[in-house]
Curated annotation (Swiss-Prot):
Other known facts: Negative results: does not show effect on both human and rat Nav1.8/SCN10A.
Domain remark from Swiss-Prot or TrEMBL: The presence of a 'disulfide through disulfide knot' structurally defines this protein as a knottin.
Signal sequence range: 1-28
Keywords, ordered alphabetically: Cleavage on pair of basic residues, Disulfide bond, Hydroxylation, Ion channel impairing toxin, Knottin, Neurotoxin, Secreted, Signal, Toxin, Voltage-gated sodium channel impairing toxin
Organism: Lineus longissimus
Main subcellular location of this protein, as a coarse class: secreted
Domain of life: Eukaryota
Molecular function GO terms recorded: sodium channel regulator activity; toxin activity
Family as reported in the entry's similarity comment: Belongs to the nemertide family.
Entry protein name: Nemertide alpha-1
Biological role stated in the UniProt entry: Potent toxin, demonstrating strong inhibitory effects on insect sodium channels (Nav) and reduced activity on mammalian sodium channels. Potently inhibits inactivation of insect sodium channels of B.germanica (BgNav1) (EC(50)=8.6 nM), D.melanogaster (Dm Nav1), and arachnid sodium channel V.destructor (VdNav1).
Modified residues annotated as 4-hydroxyproline in this record: P72, P73
Coiled-coil regions listed in the entry: none
Known tissue expression: Confined to the epidermis and to the mucus layer.
Length: 76
């Protein structure tokens, strides 16, 4: 009886550790995506307005001001 209860405790511990590992991987992945997104933002205009940049040209949306990275520059 004691052996069975201790093995159940070990299983619970293992499941808990695997769950923690899984959560860690999910959060690490989201952090990586966030940092990549930050790099695609025009530092002068996009952060101030909180708007997204298009990934294709690295241009700001019309909510942002002029973006020197656009070709041609986005002046909407």
């Amino acid at each position: 009886y004691r052996i069975a209860s201790s093995s159940i405790a070990k299983m619970k511990t293992a499941v808990f550790l695997v769950g923690l590992l899984f959560l860690g991987l999910v959060f690490a992945d989201e952090a990586a995506i966030d940092s990549e997104f930050d790099q695609s933002i025009d530092k002068r205009g996009c952060i101030a307005t909180g708007s997204f940049c298009t990934l294709s040209k690295g241009c700001c949306t019309k909510n942002c001001g002029w973006n020197f990275k656009c070709n041609p520059p986005n002046q909407k």
